[in-house]
C-alpha cells in the first residue's frame, strides 16, 4: 500500500508512510493521486481529496463530517440510538430562542459551544447569570440535561473495533471530567453496555477513528460525544498498539475492494472472449 500522511505524530510508526506538510498539499498532487490511502488530512483538505482526487482517507469521511460539530453529531446519534442520547435542545442564538430554551430546561443543565474540545466549551448552567455568560460566547445554542455523574468513560474505537479505554473521574474543581481540565484517570473495567453502545454507534455511522465519551447512569449508557483526534493520555501501552491496529484495518479494507484479491472472481490478465 502507498500511504500518505498529513500528521507526522499519529503516523510516526506506520511503515513506509510518506509525510507531507499540510501547507504543501497542492505541490504534491502527483503523490496524492498515487496514494492508496491519505491519512489524517486536515479538515480543509477533505473536499479536494475525496471529491477532487477521489482518494480514500483515514479517518473516514463520516468521522470528519459528523465529528466537526456537536450539533450535527448529536443529530446523527439521535438517528441511530435516540434512547442513549441525553435530552438535547438546539436553536439559533437569538433572544427569542434563548428565552424559550431557558424556560424549557430544568436547572442545572449543560450548555455547549458546538465547535469546541477538551471541555473548554462546556458549561454547567445553574443560574440566569451563567446562562447570559454562555449566550455571549456561542454562535448557536446547544443545551442538554445534566446527568448525575461524577465520572465518565473515554472508549477508543479504531477501525472496526474497541481497542480499550478508561474512566475519567471528575476534577477537584467539579463538573469537568476532561483530563485537560483536571479529570483523573481510573482503569477500572469498562462496562459491557458502554462498549456495546460504542460498537453500535461507530458501525452505524461509519466512524473508524474516535474517542467516545460515554456516561453511565445507574448502569445505563448515554453517549455525550466523540473526538476524531483524541489524546493519548490514559491509554498507556495501548499507544504502542494503535499503529498496528490502523495498518491492519487499512490492509483489510484495501483487500475488500481489490478484485485481484478475490480468489473466486479474479481480474483476468487478458480480455475474456465472448
Model regions and ranges:
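Active-site nucleotide/adenylate-binding loops and adjacent lid/helix of ATP-dependent enzymes
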Residues: 13, 65-150, 191-195, 252
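Phosphate-binding site of ATP-dependent enzymes
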Residues: 120-205
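Hydrophobic residue at the +6 position relative to the catalytic HRD Asp in the kinase catalytic loop
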Residues: 212-214
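C-terminal active-site "lid" helix and adjoining low-complexity regulatory extension at the edge
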Residues: 203, 216-274
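Conserved N-proximal alpha/beta basic substrate-recognition cap immediately N-terminal to
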Residues: 2-96
